From Swiss-Prot:
This is tRNA (guanine-N(7)-)-methyltransferase. It catalyses: guanosine(46) in tRNA + S-adenosyl-L-methionine = N(7)-methylguanosine(46) in tRNA + S-adenosyl-L-homocysteine. Pfam families: Methyltransf_4. The gene is trmB. PANTHER family: 3-DEOXY-D-MANNO-OCTULOSONIC-ACID TRANSFERASE/TRNA GUANINE-N 7 - -METHYLTRANSFERASE, TRNA (GUANINE-N(7)-)-METHYLTRANSFERASE.
C-alpha cells in the first residue's frame, strides 16, 4: 500500500477540526467489549498500535488522530491484519472530549498514552497543543482508578508542560521521583521514538497512576 502524504502539522483550532468526535458503535468495532482499553491520543499512522494490538490481544486499543488520511490508512492496515481489538478514529480530542469518552465501554479505560505530540513551539500557539487542562479533567473523570497515563516527547519543554498539567490534577499521581522516566513502559516503541534514539537524542517521559 502506498504511503499517504499529509501535512506534518494541522491547526486544531481551524474550523475544519472544531467538531466533536463522532463515536462509532463500539459493539461493531471490538470483538470482546469486556477487555480493558488503551487510548492513544495523536496516533499518527498507527504503527505503534498496530503492533501493540498483536502483542497484547487481550487489550482493546483505540487511536485518535486529527489527520484524517492517516486514520483511513491505519484502518485499512488494521483490516488487512484482521485485528478485532483495534480501532482508529478521526478527530480532535480537545473539542468536547467527554462525548467520545462517555461513549466508551464503561470502566474499561485503563491506559492513556500521549506520545510525541506536535510541539507548537511558539507561545501564541500554545492552545494548539494537545494536553490542555480541559482534556486532563475529562480523562480524570472517565479513567479507571488504578489506570495509567504515559507521556513522552523529544521536546523537553513540551514534556514538562504535559507533566505539569497532569500533576496539577489530584486524580493523577506521578510514579517516579526522578525528573524523567528512563524506560518506555510499553514493549513497542513509536516511529518517532526510534528516530529520536537513532539520532542520539533524549526522550522525556512521565508516568502517572490514576487515583
Amino acid at each position: 500500500m502506498a504511503k499517504v502524504r499529509v501535512r506534518q502539522h494541522v491547526n486544531p483550532l481551524s474550523h475544519k477540526y472544531r467538531h466533536p468526535i463522532a463515536p462509532p458503535d463500539w459493539n461493531q468495532v471490538y470483538q470482546d467489549m469486556t477487555q480493558p482499553l488503551h487510548l492513544d491520543i495523536g496516533c499518527a499512522r498507527g504503527k505503534f498500535l498496530l503492533q501493540m494490538a498483536q502483542v497484547e490481544p487481550e487489550i482493546n486499543f483505540l487511536g485518535i488522530e486529527i489527520r484524517q488520511p492517516l486514520v483511513i490508512e491505519a484502518n485499512q492496515e488494521r483490516e488487512r491484519l484482521g485485528l478485532s481489538n483495534l480501532a482508529f478514529v478521526f478527530g480532535n480530542m480537545n473539542v468536547a472530549p467527554e462525548i467520545l469518552l462517555q461513549s466508551l465501554p464503561a470502566d474499561k479505560l485503563f491506559w492513556v498514552s500521549i506520545q510525541f505530540p506536535d510541539p507548537w513551539f511558539k507561545q501564541r500557539h500554545s492552545k494548539r497543543r494537545v494536553v490542555q487542562p480541559e482534556l486532563v479533567i475529562a480523562l480524570a473523570k472517565y479513567m479507571v482508578a488504578g489506570g495509567w497515563v504515559f507521556l513522552q516527547s523529544d521536546v523537553e519543554s513540551i514534556a514538562l508542560e504535559m507533566t505539569e498539567r497532569f500533576q496539577a490534577h489530584p486524580h493523577f499521581v506521578r510514579q517516579h521521583q526522578t525528573p524523567w522516566l528512563e524506560e518506555n513502559i510499553f514493549p513497542v516503541p513509536t516511529e518517532r521514538e526510534k528516530s529520536t534514539y537513532n539520532k542520539g537524542q533524549p526522550v522525556y517521559r512521565s508516568l502517572f497512576r490514576v487515583r
